[in-house]
Amino acid sequence: VQPIRLQVQYRMHPCLSEFPSNAFYEGTLQNGVTEAERADSEEVFPWPCPSKPMMFWAQMGVEEMSASGYSYLNRGEAYAVEKIVAHLLQNGISPDEIGVVTPYEGQRAYVVNYLTRTGVLHPSIYQEVEVASVDAFQGREKQYIIVTCVRSNDRQGIGFLNDPRRLNVALTRAKLGLMMVGNPKVLAKQPLFRDMLQHFRDNKCLVEGNNINQLNECMVALPQARWKTRAAGLARFRAKQTIDEENASENYNVNV
């Protein structure tokens, strides 16, 4: 079946659809919802830019091999995830409205354990927060999505994250707010991630710091973005196919 090209999205706050539209749809993806329809209370989360419910929180912790020997985890990113989740819960967000997305089973298992054992709130509350793989979240949505990228190493390798379809899915699951945590120095080696990080920076949403209420703009150097490289173009095409195929499988409902 030939996928229908997505033209209108009804899920995301308009600022969250901007990068997917530019990266995968040549800027043609239209918004079927307004900012007012996707606005949350200003008290819910200390967004770096109050009018844009998104952020990339730079974490420089080193990745580790998981106990299985076949996956990866990142303790520093798990710490950041807990801080974000706790802040949302403490400000009235229901745990079933929060999703934590990661490309690695090792990180998924570690985050689940970290939240219940180390979190500042009662373990039973964290147990209601869904922590799952990128693939498990395809075709689904949450009010708030937290993405932990995991990879952080001297070799500058990002493994599964090289698949643009996974990035595409991760970026398009949130309705009201998107938080990402990762190592921008490592991720920026991949052209599509580099463009995404530059997008966060252009919107003053690429931040760093230890206190979630006092994050500062991250000044890490990023390679110059090259939107029209062959690699980036191919990545955008493949990632767009993921949304188109998902759209076709959902009875042609244009809901990214």
Model-derived segments and spans:
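Hydrophobic/aromatic beta-strand patches that form the interior of the parallel beta-sheet core
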Residues: 4-6, 55-57, 132, 145-146, ...
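Conserved helicase C-terminal RecA-like lobe
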Residues: 87-101, 105-172, 184-188, 204-210
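Helicase C-terminal subdomain and adjacent C-terminal extension
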Residues: 1, 121, 156-256
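Conserved helicase/translocase motor-coupling segment
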Residues: 31-114
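Alpha-helical scaffold elements adjacent to nucleotide-binding pockets in ATP/GTP-utilizing enzyme cores
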Residues: 15-23, 110-114, 173, 195, ...
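Helical mechanochemical/support elements of P-loop NTPase systems and associated helical scaffolds
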Residues: 12-15, 74-80, 107, 163-166, ...
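Short, conserved catalytic or adaptor-binding loops enriched in Gly and charged residues
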Residues: 22, 44-49, 119-125
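Conserved coupling/interface region of RecA-like P-loop/ASCE motor cores
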Residues: 1-40, 103-105, 184
